[in-house]
Structure formats: structure tokens, C-alpha cells
């Protein structure tokens, strides 16, 4: 830590400015008020599309960074309000239309439902039998499992949460208006990164985790322990009363009684004295290091989760005291930046990280680009942990929820990462000043861009040719009836030795990585089968030739996505083809008339193309996950302890040919969605067709050019003129960029909804 003389600290001064900027609907009610041209009203039909395109482009409304910052800050509160309203809706459905209590009473036989379809013209067929006499639509969001983890024991509590979330939404809306129209932060407040880091690290993450750990210890852990005992058929006794049903469990506020809590966790009786005297072992019954999964619920131990949050809290509270604010002590981010001189081998930059501090505190696009890339990566990591280390009770045996959560977190991650590239490119076009980045690391990366992109291109060709080549070889050999010449576990074996080594290392490390951990980090890494209610919750995952092959397809598609996105960022300002690209802006269709062969070079077009490859990459990932789990992990446990897997372990032999993927996965598992009519999954059958249509509709926008439509429109306008019904607003074809945007939006929406219907109809029936 840098200890500086006291004069280096800055005096605290007001960071907020009182503004007289009344919130008036006179202004907001006027479409296009933010743009002089749009405010004049529509002359052509392009007006409405430009309105949509530019409404949230605050940079285009004003060049005043403080004003832009205030608008973004205010919009964040609006976003939070929408989230609270959305949460309130989820809680309300749980309170009013769900079988939550029924599910809590028998989670292995009752399916979760929080939606009941009302009969109007026969759609009550969609209400399936959820068990225990409840008819409804099965949900796959995992909310019931989360609520049980929080310690919610009744629909009444959910209704209280629904009301509370609406109150919070109101507060957020109020805050958004107040901090823009009444008391708005000054620019220096937004740029005070040390203070922001201290507050976010120590406050949001540190104290947030600590208070959550408090909830887990005082509410979640005791409620979970009592429920687990009921589910295991060995109910516990509290104050001489047997807790035989969920209704018998004390309400959260009753656990304020320390004596009551100490009956479940004697360590609570040690009080706070044990903490200050260093006798932390007294707490080892509710802050545990068990590892593995709870055999009753197939989820991580609640006391392990509480311990984790205490540890996270300590780390982040310490981290939140590292940065220099009003006192001359701690790190300065600017000094840290300027002390870094870059990588001496890869990017020897004489000026190191000089100028990056200013770039990141004046370009919110640059900041957002980094944050989206990291948050997207985090979402993808969450997807992997949902099955490898399931945190919520009974979630691991709710296969539809597991597929749903994996798919959801993968898509979210993909979109955020592409968004990261988009905002990085916008930052390069709008905010990057080459004069301020001479020979620093960013400049050196830009100077090396040809080497970076050409190498990445070579990697993509190598991965694509070899990984696809393995499949082509196998399809050819199988077609010719030569199984002995195929790449497979039983013929020419290619084992993923590095992945197997990682699995073994994790399995062997139990007991040595964490103090006295009783089990390994995940059963997926060479652990043992955990069965709950006769279904597999977790099991060791065997890896072989089929996994090796599809893994390299993943490597190929991810690298192509990175190639497209990175090329868009590195060539956003200029290229050999268009040296003055920065002057043309973030999105432009081509470099003007008379300059052919310059289409699809804008940074926006790279985002557009990157989205397709992101979709491509993740489709293969979620198909791989879905099939692998059904083949090698999920299934029912027989009386002799053997496992009957859903697809009987066919992955290793079928996933090594393209024909196998098409026939034994896509076609075989589409049986349920194609045959769903007349059953309670028929909505997915219709959705499967409808989403295919939306996907196909996108191709009309992607394959045809603007001129085709403009010609057609002019002929239609002629007919209107003939009939004297000409419109006052002149019809215009979508611009080239708008057409592509509509195309990619429908392509992704159609593709994702098709996959959703395909997964659901299948796994709801067989899972």
C-alpha cells in the first residue's frame, strides 16, 4: 500500500448540484424532442425507425459529458424499477397461482407450477398434472428452489415480497426523477473512481455479502435444516414440539430468539464473545467446510454457503479500504495505471498505461465494454456451476430447470460479451483520441492489429479444418461400413487427457485444499453418484473421444466469434481499405456511392456478424450440454444401484458423426415437440413452428437489398396515387443497416424460441 503525505488527500466537497429542471410531460410527450430533425415530426416513414434508433443514444443528443452521465445514472434507477416490477410479478404468481406449498411438502414428486391457464377456447389443455391434485403449467425458472433456499415457507410470505418489490420499484422511480431533476451528481462524482471502488467493494459486495450471510445463518440454515429433516422422514424437535410439516416451522422473526436457534446450531449459543476471543471453532456447526452435496436435497450444504458468504464479505470489506480518497492513504488508480509499463515481451510500450485512466473516466463506452465482457463471462461461468455445484435444494433433479438455467445463462453471457465488443468499438470511434495514446499499450495493440488478426484467422482455419475434418472422416468411414477406422473410444481413440487430469486433480485434492473438507469440490469431477428420490442429482462425468471432438468445435466457433468482434474493435477507426473510417461513424452501410466493395466494414456490421457466430457457438454448447447430461449423468437409479440414463449413454458412439448429431440428437429428441398436439405440451409444438417462421422471416431481410424494396414501394405508391389515397407521410424502405438489424433480431429471436420449445417439450416429457 502507498502511504502518502497528508496533503495528497483531497478535501471533501459537495458532489451534488441542486438543479431546477422540472419533470414535465410537455417535453417528454413530444416524440423526438431530443433531436432537432426528429422533433419536426415525420415527413417519411424513416422517422419512426430513426426515433427508435436514436432515443437512447445520449451521445447524439448532447456532447456534455456531465449531462450524458446524469441521464445514464437516472436511467439506471428506471431499469431497477422495471426489475423490481418484474420480480413483483414473479412473487405474485408464486403467491396467487402456484403450488409452492404443495411442492415444499413433496419436492421429489410434485412439479413446480406458478401459472394456471383459464379456459376460454379450450386452452386449459395446457394445464398438466403437477402432482398432489394441482393442474397448471410447469415452470423451469428455478424460482421455487431459490425461495426454499431463502427460507420462504408460505404463499403469504411471497405476497408480502410482491408488495415489497412494488414499493421498491416506486422508490427507484422516485430516485431516478430526484437525481436528475432535483439534485443531480456533478461530473467529478461520476469520475471519482477511488470512492466508487471503496463503496462498491466494501458496501455493495462486502456488507451485502455479510448481511446475506446473516440471513443465511439466522433464517435459511435453520429453516432448511428443519425442512431437510422432514423430507428425510426424521423430523426435528424444537422446544419440545415435533416439526412434522412445513407449517410447523417457526416464522423468521421467531429465530431472533437465540435459545431457539441454539437448539439447531449450538454454536449460536456461544454468542459474539467467541468471535472477539478468537474461539472461532465454536461456530463450526453453522459455518462449515463439508464439500460435496447434501444427500437429502442434492444441493450444496446451506452451512457451506453461509461460510462462503462470510469469507467473501471479509475479502471485499478489506478490498474496499484500499483506495485513496479524502485521506492521504491508499492506492491511486491513476498512479497504478501510470506505474504499469506493459508486457516487455509482447507489447513493449514506452508509455505503458499512460492515458488509460483518462480514457476510462471520460469514455463510458470503454468502461461499459470492459464491464459487459466480464459480466458476460461471469454469466457463462454461472451456467457451468448450476449443474456442477447445484446451490438450491432439489434443483439438480429437476432436469427441465437445469437445462433451462444452463441455456439461459449461456445466452445471457453471449449477448453481454457481444455487447462488450459493441461498446468497445463505439468507444474507439467516438471517444478515442490518438494524440493522447502515443506508444501506450492500447496504441501498441492497435499497431500490432494486423499480426493479431492474421494469427487469429490462422487459428480459426486450423481449428475449423481439423475439428470438422474429424467428423467428416468419421461420417465417411461409417457410411462405408468401416467402424474400425473411425475416431472413437473403441477404435482410434483420442482421449481428452488434460481434461481428465483436471478431473482427477480435483477429486484427489479433497481434504487438502480446504481445511478438513469432507468431500471434493464437485461430484462431476470423479466423485460419486448422488441420488435424490431415485433420480441422479450429480455423478462423475466420463470424458472420451466424442467430448474431445465437440470441444474442438467449441474452440473453433468461439475463436471465429472473437475474430469478428476483435476485428471490429481494432479496425473501428481505420483500415487499409477505408483509412478515414472514424469519420464515417460507428454504423454506416458502405463508403458512399462510387466506392464499391466497401459494404459491411463498419464497427456496427462486425457486431451484426458477431451475433450470428455467437448464436452458432452457443447453440452447439447447449446442444452438447443437453445431450451429454441426458446420456451420461441424468436418469433413474435402479434397485441394484445401477443408473438407467435418459438416452442410455448413446453420446460416446453417436456424437462422433454429423449424421449422429442430426439423427440421434436433433431428430430423436424432436419427437416430443412434433407429436405434442393434443397434449399439455402442445403450446411448445405451436411455438416450435411459430419460432421457425420468425427465423425464416429474418432471411427475407438478410438476403434482399434495400433497392429491391424501394422499387416495390414506389410501384405501390403509384397505385395509391392512381386511386387518390396517397399517404401524407412518404413511404421509404428501411435503410440497409435497419434491414440488417431487423434481420438479425428475428434470426436470434426465432432461433432461441425454437430451441426453447424443442428443449422444453422433450425434457418435460422424459425428464
UniProtKB/Swiss-Prot annotation:
Subunit architecture: The PsaA/B heterodimer binds the P700 chlorophyll special pair and subsequent electron acceptors. PSI consists of a core antenna complex that captures photons, and an electron transfer chain that converts photonic excitation into a charge separation. The cyanobacterial PSI reaction center is composed of one copy each of PsaA,B,C,D,E,F,I,J,K,L,M and X, and forms trimeric complexes.
Membrane-protein topology: Multi-pass membrane protein
A GO CC annotation given for this chain: photosystem I
UniProt name for this protein: Photosystem I P700 chlorophyll a apoprotein A1
Main location: membrane
Coiled-coil boundaries: none
Family indicated by similarity: Belongs to the PsaA/PsaB family.
Location of the protein in the cell: Cellular thylakoid membrane
Keyword Transport: yes
Cofactor note: PSI electron transfer chain: 5 chlorophyll a, 1 chlorophyll a', 2 phylloquinones and 3 4Fe-4S clusters. PSI core antenna: 90 chlorophyll a, 22 carotenoids, 3 phospholipids and 1 galactolipid. P700 is a chlorophyll a/chlorophyll a' dimer, A0 is one or more chlorophyll a, A1 is one or both phylloquinones and FX is a shared 4Fe-4S iron-sulfur center.
Pfam families: PsaA_PsaB (PF00223)
Amino acid at each position: 500500500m502507498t502511504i502518502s503525505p497528508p496533503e495528497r488527500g483531497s478535501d471533501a466537497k459537495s458532489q451534488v448540484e441542486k438543479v431546477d429542471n422540472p419533470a414535465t410531460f410537455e417535453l417528454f410527450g413530444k416524440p423526438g424532442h431530443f433531436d432537432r430533425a426528429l422533433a419536426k415530426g415525420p415527413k417519411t416513414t424513416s422517422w419512426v425507425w430513426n426515433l427508435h434508433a436514436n432515443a437512447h443514444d445520449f451521445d447524439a443528443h448532447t456532447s456534455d459529458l456531465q449531462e450524458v452521465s446524469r441521464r445514464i445514472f437516472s436511467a439506471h434507477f428506471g431499469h431497477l424499477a422495471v426489475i423490481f416490477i418484474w420480480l413483483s410479478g414473479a412473487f405474485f404468481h408464486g403467491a396467487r397461482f402456484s403450488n409452492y406449498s404443495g411442492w415444499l411438502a413433496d419436492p421429489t414428486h410434485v412439479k413446480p407450477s406458478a401459472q394456471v391457464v383459464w379456459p376460454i377456447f379450450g386452452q386449459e389443455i395446457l394445464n398438466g398434472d403437477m402432482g398432489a391434485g394441482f393442474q397448471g403449467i410447469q415452470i423451469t425458472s428455478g424460482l421455487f428452489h431459490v425461495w426454499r433456499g431463502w427460507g420462504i415457507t408460505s404463499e403469504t410470505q411471497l405476497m408480502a415480497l410482491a408488495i415489497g418489490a412494488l414499493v421498491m420499484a416506486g422508490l427507484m422511480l422516485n430516485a431516478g426523477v430526484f437525481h436528475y431533476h432535483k439534485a443531480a451528481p456533478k461530473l467529478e462524482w461520476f469520475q471519482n473512481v477511488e470512492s466508487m471502488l471503496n463503496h462498491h467493494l466494501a458496501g455493495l459486495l462486502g456488507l451485502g455479502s455479510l448481511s446475506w450471510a446473516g440471513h443465511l445463518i439466522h433464517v435459511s440454515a435453520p429453516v432448511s435444516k428443519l425442512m431437510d429433516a422432514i423430507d428425510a422422514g426424521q423430523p426435528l424437535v424444537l422446544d419440545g414440539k415435533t416439526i412434522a410439516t412445513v407449517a410447523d416451522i417457526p416464522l423468521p422473526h421467531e429465530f431472533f430468539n437465540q435459545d431457539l436457534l441454539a437448539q439447531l446450531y449450538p454454536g449460536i449459543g456461544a454468542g459474539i464473545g467467541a468471535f472477539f476471543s478468537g474461539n472461532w471453532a465454536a461456530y463450526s456447526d453453522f459455518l462449515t467446510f463439508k464439500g460435496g452435496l447434501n444427500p437429502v436435497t442434492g444441493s450444496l450444504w446451506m452451512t457451506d454457503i453461509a461460510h462462503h458468504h462470510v469469507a467473501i464479505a471479509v475479502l471485499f470489506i478489506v478490498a474496499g479500504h484500499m483506495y485513496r480518497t479524502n485521506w492521504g492513504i491508499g492506492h491511486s488508480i491513476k498512479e497504478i495505471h501510470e506505474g504499469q509499463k506493459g508486457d516487455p515481451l509482447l507489447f513493449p510500450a514506452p508509455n505503458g498505461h499512460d492515458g488509460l485512466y483518462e480514457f476510462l473516466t471520460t469514455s463510458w463506452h470503454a468502461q461499459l465494454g470492459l464491464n459487459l465482457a466480464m459480466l458476460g463471462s461471469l454469466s457463462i461461468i454461472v451456467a457451468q456451476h448450476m449443474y456442477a455445484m447445484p446451490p438450491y435444494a432439489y434443483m439438480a433433479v429437476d432436469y427441465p430447470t437445469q437445462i433451462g438455467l444452463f441455456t439461459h445463462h449461456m445466452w445471457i453471457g453471449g449477448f453481454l460479451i457481444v455487447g462488450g465488443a459493441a461498446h468497445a468499438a463505439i468507444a474507439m470511434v467516438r471517444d478515442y483520441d490518438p494524440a493522447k495514446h502515443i506508444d501506450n499499450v492500447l496504441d501498441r495493440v492497435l499497431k500490432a492489429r494486423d499480426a493479431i488478426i492474421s494469427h487469429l484467422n490462422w487459428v480459426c482455419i486450423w481449428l475449423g479444418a481439423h475439428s470438422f475434418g474429424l467428423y467428416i472422416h468419421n461420417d465417411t468411414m461409417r457410411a462405408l461400413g468401416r467402424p474400425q477406422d473411425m475416431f472413437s473410444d473403441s477404435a482410434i481413440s483420442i482421449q481428452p487427457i488434460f481434461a481428465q487430469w483436471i478431473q482427477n486433480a480435483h477429486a484427489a485434492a479433497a481434504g487438502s485444499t480446504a481445511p478438513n473438507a469432507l468431500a471434493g469440490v464437485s461430484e462431476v469431477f470423479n466423485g460419486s453418484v448422488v441420488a435424490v428420490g431415485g433420480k441422479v442429482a450429480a455423478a462423475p462425468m466420463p470424458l472420451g473421444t466424442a467430448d474431445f471432438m465437440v470441444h474442438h468445435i467449441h474452440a473453433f466457433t468461439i475463436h471465429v466469434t472473437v475474430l469478428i468482434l476483435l476485428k471490429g474493435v481494432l479496425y473501428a477507426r481505420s483500415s487499409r481499405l477505408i483509412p478515414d473510417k472514424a469519420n464515417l461513424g460507428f454504423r454506416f452501410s458502405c463508403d458512399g456511392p462510387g466506392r464499391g466493395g466497401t459494404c459491411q466494414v463498419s464497427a456496427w456490421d462486425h457486431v451484426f456478424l458477431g451475433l450470428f457466430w455467437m448464436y452458432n457457438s452457443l447453440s452447439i454448447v447447449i446442444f452438447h450440454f443437453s445431450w451429454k447430461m441426458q446420456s451420461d449423468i441424468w436418469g433413474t437409479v435402479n434397485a441394484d444401484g445401477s443408473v438407467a440414463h435418459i438416452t442410455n449413454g448413446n453420446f460416446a458412439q453417436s456424437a462422433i458423426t454429423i449424421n449422429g448429431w442430426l439423427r440421434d440428437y436433433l431428430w430423436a429428441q424432436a419427437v416430443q415437440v412434433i407429436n405434442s398436439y393434443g397434449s399439455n405440451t402442445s403450446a411448445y409444438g405451436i411455438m416450435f413452428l411459430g419460432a421457425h417462421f420468425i427465423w425464416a422471416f429474418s432471411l427475407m431481410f438478410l438476403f434482399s437489398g434495400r433497392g429491391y424494396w424501394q422499387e416495390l414501394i414506389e410501384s405501390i405508391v403509384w397505385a395509391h396515387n392512381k386511386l387518390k389515397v396517397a399517404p401524407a407521410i412518404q413511404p421509404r424502405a428501411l435503410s440497409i443497416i435497419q434491414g440488417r438489424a431487423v434481420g438479425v433480431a428475428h434470426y436470434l429471436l426465432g432461433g432461441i424460441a425454437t430451441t426453447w420449445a424443442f428443449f422444453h417439450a422433450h425434457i418435460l416429457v422424459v425428464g
